[in-house]
Amino acid sequence: MKTKIILSTLLMLTFWCNAQTTDSALKEVQKIIEASNKTFSDFTNKNDGSIVARYTDDACLFPPNGEPKCGAKQIDSFFRGGPQVHVIFTIQNLYGDPKTAVTEESFYEMTDMNGKKLDDGKVIVIWKKTKEGWKMHRDMFSDNHPAKQG
């Protein structure tokens, strides 16, 4: 009986320690993603295609009310020529395997360069760990406002 109790305790400690490690690793990944999110609009505002480096080679962007944009050329085309804006992302949930891929659920608020609110909404991004670091693999977003009627 004593052996069973000891084994059960060791087993519980093993699971608990593993959960702590994963939790800690996810927090580290979240810090990396938050840093990337803080500079997102800087890259889109450059209008020079540098935003594409934030995505995996086989990434897809899923904008609202439009076809998916897959690959560097289409993603660059989507962002190029867009308005100068500032976007703040607030991560609500982050889950997955901190060694390979995680999913980010965030809210965003978009303002013009003078701070006037233009839009707000939600984002789901699947981040993939690459040899160059964490990159966006799938990026889907939509605003929080009803569709405008014709």
Predicted stretch roles:
Residues M1-S24:
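Bacterial Sec-dependent N-terminal signal peptides
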Residues C17-R54, A147-G150:
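Short, low-complexity N-terminal intrinsically disordered segments enriched in polar/charged residues
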Residues T39-N47, R54, D58, F78-G82, ...:
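Structured segments of extracytoplasmic/periplasmic soluble domains
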Residues F40, I51-V52, A59, G71, ...:
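Hydrophobic pocket/interface hotspot
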Residues D58-K69, R80-Q84:
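A short gly/proline-enriched turn/hairpin at secondary-structure junctions
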Residues D76-G115:
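Surface-exposed, charged secondary-structure patches
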Residues K122-A147:
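Short beta-strand edge/turn micro-motifs at domain boundaries
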